[in-house]
Amino acid sequence: MKLNPNDVVIIDAVRSPMGKTKNGVFRNVRAENLSAALVKELFKRNPNVDQKDVEDLIWGCVNQTLEQGFNMARAVSLLAGLPITCAAQTVNRLCGSSMSAIHTAAQAIMTGQGDVFVVGGVEHMGHVGMMHGVDVNPALSKHMAKASMMMGVTAEMLGKMHGVSREDQDAFAVRSHRLAHEATLQGRFNNEIVSIEGHDADGNKILVEVDEVIRPETSMESLAKLAPVFMPKVGTVTAGTSSALSDGASAMLMMSAKKAEELGLTPIAKVRSMAVAGCDPAIMGYGPVPATKKALKRAGLTIADIDIVELNEAFAAQSIPVLKDLGLLDLVDDKVNLNGGAIALGHPLGCSGTRISTTLLNVMREKDATVGLATMCIGMGQGIATVFERV
């Protein structure tokens, strides 16, 4: 494929192992250090790239307080040893934060506002709880129900609207854990995971090389024993069919096609199109549908043209309606989350956008696929989507 000079290309993409939020392997590792380790690895893997050429480090993070506050991206840049001339910004689009980082860098490259960018995101949910310090404006009650701030309740509503059964959700979750476990055993995550120091249950320092949150023992029988967690007695969404709480980071090295050619680098893929969209906060999990439709239209594609899909599995009750309305439900085993999703791997909020994009690019390479879609829902009613094309 012939690239145009201002095409946006991905040179490399990595992530940390996903650690459990409660007493997990990264309980003694700060979010900035988890992030900086990935940035260092990107340049270790790509020595031809001069760090002085980096225009901006753009880092997604949702709860920007405590160790994740005060423009954490700048701390990540400095801790990673990037030159002081490299700028840095922290972005927040809730669950879509690090995918927004991809979009921000892509838009800059497309308009000639820089050639080399480092993007990514992190969330240490063990150190900074999801709702820590949140103070919601009471006036929002005029525009959305209070329950719209409770993601699990919105998943219950979306599932009910689309007739998603408890059994359907349990089966979806079992699949996620099974595929993630198989991918781990078969080494399919090896190219994307960067080993990072952490601590075992006894406090001994260890090198963490695989995801801690996958539960290979998950079965229909074990999930059937779980009670609904968000709407007791009447609900269907359980902890087992929700994305796992986890700590993790992910990162990408992006540049213009012109710069990649100048450096003699072979890109993994190019950004074909991008989109964000709003939806009713009460069914925030539906956001990938309008966002994906926008992105496909901008790329001049239909969903049939997409070879591989990574959908962030916030909840099974949310994922199934999205796949149904995108025309993918009958193609799940051929195209969707082939190495498992967030139900198994976890959803460290600010990390997930570049995490699912990283996994997508690796699956595309493994399957020799041409076009891939990464998309996710966003709290308070949004969706975000990116179409990638291998080059």
Curated annotation (Swiss-Prot):
<keyword id="KW-0276">Fatty acid metabolism</keyword>
<dbReference type="InterPro" id="IPR050215">
    <property type="entry name" value="Thiolase-like_sf_Thiolase"/>
</dbReference>
<dbReference type="Pfam" id="PF00108">
    <property type="entry name" value="Thiolase_N"/>
</dbReference>
<keyword id="KW-0012">Acyltransferase</keyword>
<feature type="active site" description="Proton acceptor">
    <location>
        <position position="347"/>
    </location>
</feature>
<dbReference type="GO" id="GO:0006635">
    <property type="term" value="P:fatty acid beta-oxidation"/>
</dbReference>
<dbReference type="InterPro" id="IPR020616">
    <property type="entry name" value="Thiolase_N"/>
</dbReference>
<dbReference type="InterPro" id="IPR020610">
    <property type="entry name" value="Thiolase_AS"/>
</dbReference>
<dbReference type="GO" id="GO:0010124">
    <property type="term" value="P:phenylacetate catabolic process"/>
</dbReference>
<comment type="similarity">
    <text>Belongs to the thiolase-like superfamily. Thiolase family.</text>
</comment>
<protein>
    <recommendedName>
        <fullName>3-ketoacyl-CoA thiolase</fullName>
        <ecNumber>2.3.1.16</ecNumber>
    </recommendedName>
</protein>
<comment type="subunit">
    <text>Heterotetramer of two alpha chains (FadB) and two beta chains (FadA).</text>
</comment>
<feature type="active site" description="Proton acceptor">
    <location>
        <position position="377"/>
    </location>
</feature>
<dbReference type="Pfam" id="PF02803">
    <property type="entry name" value="Thiolase_C"/>
</dbReference>
<comment type="pathway">
    <text>Lipid metabolism; fatty acid beta-oxidation.</text>
</comment>
<keyword id="KW-0442">Lipid degradation</keyword>
<dbReference type="InterPro" id="IPR002155">
    <property type="entry name" value="Thiolase"/>
</dbReference>
<keyword id="KW-0443">Lipid metabolism</keyword>
<feature type="active site" description="Acyl-thioester intermediate">
    <location>
        <position position="95"/>
    </location>
</feature>
<dbReference type="InterPro" id="IPR020617">
    <property type="entry name" value="Thiolase_C"/>
</dbReference>
<dbReference type="InterPro" id="IPR016039">
    <property type="entry name" value="Thiolase-like"/>
</dbReference>
<dbReference type="GO" id="GO:0005737">
    <property type="term" value="C:cytoplasm"/>
</dbReference>
<dbReference type="InterPro" id="IPR020615">
    <property type="entry name" value="Thiolase_acyl_enz_int_AS"/>
</dbReference>
<dbReference type="GO" id="GO:0003988">
    <property type="term" value="F:acetyl-CoA C-acyltransferase activity"/>
</dbReference>
<keyword id="KW-0808">Transferase</keyword>
<keyword id="KW-0963">Cytoplasm</keyword>
<comment type="function">
    <text>Catalyzes the final step of fatty acid oxidation in which acetyl-CoA is released and the CoA ester of a fatty acid two carbons shorter is formed.</text>
</comment>
<dbReference type="InterPro" id="IPR020613">
    <property type="entry name" value="Thiolase_CS"/>
</dbReference>
<dbReference type="InterPro" id="IPR012805">
    <property type="entry name" value="FadA"/>
</dbReference>
